[in-house]
From Swiss-Prot:
Keywords: Ribonucleoprotein, Ribosomal protein
Gene3D superfamilies in the cross-refs: Ribosomal protein l15e
GO cellular component: a single term: cytosolic large ribosomal subunit
Signal peptide start and end residues: none
GO biological process: cytoplasmic translation
GO molecular function: RNA binding; structural constituent of ribosome
Pfam families attached to this UniProt entry: Ribosomal_L15e
Taxonomic classification: Archaea, Thermoproteota, Thermoprotei, Sulfolobales, Sulfolobaceae
Protein name, UniProt field: Large ribosomal subunit protein eL15
UniProt biased composition (Basic residues): 170-188
Entry's family note: Belongs to the eukaryotic ribosomal protein eL15 family.
Spans annotated as Disordered: 170-201
Biased composition (Basic and acidic residues): 189-201
Highest taxon, organism lineage: Archaea
Annotated gene: rpl15e
Amino acid sequence: MTLSVYHYIENTWNSEEWKKGVLRQRFIEWRKEPSIVRLAKPTRLNRARSLGYKAKQGFVIVRVRVRRGGLNKPRPNKGRRPKRMGVYGYGPAKGYKWIAEERAARKYPNLEVLGSYYVGEDGLYKYYEIIMVDPSHPVIKNDPNYKWLQDPSNRNRVFRGLTSAGKKARGLRKSKGFKGTVKHKWSRKQKEREEKKRHEASKYYRLQRYDKIPGK
């Protein structure tokens, strides 16, 4: 079987030589650029094509840079131990890909987000490329595969969590696979009942429940 060019693009992108050589040099250049940059063509053509990108008028590729790490929570000035200060270990409820899509949509309010894909990350930032479509462009209007973006129900779809990254952050994909089935829920509840029964049968539970002296 003859392999397509996208197969070789993916293998090249996943190779360690590419990551340590070309991609690392690109990260150095991307840090000097603005956080939102419009591109002439996608960096990962195989991922862009799999998400619906076409090399035609009306399609725009935007690279967005998002800061890595958790939230910068303010450190309280009242007394408590450092573990309970609530400064470290807290991240955003949204995914970084969804945040990147929203920033691109605010930068280009006349475009709609079709999808996005991961490009890479360094020590400070994560980089995503956003596929955006102009629903008012004549080429898009006459394309039966993309004219659904003109529907008012799809306006500002990224801000309503209708993109792939938004649905994932909203938890709409948890039912896919074994974890969302009734059998999995039943087995999980059965495991909780067994753990509770085992705990109640322990000596610590009996002493804690019956050996307490009232008023002390």
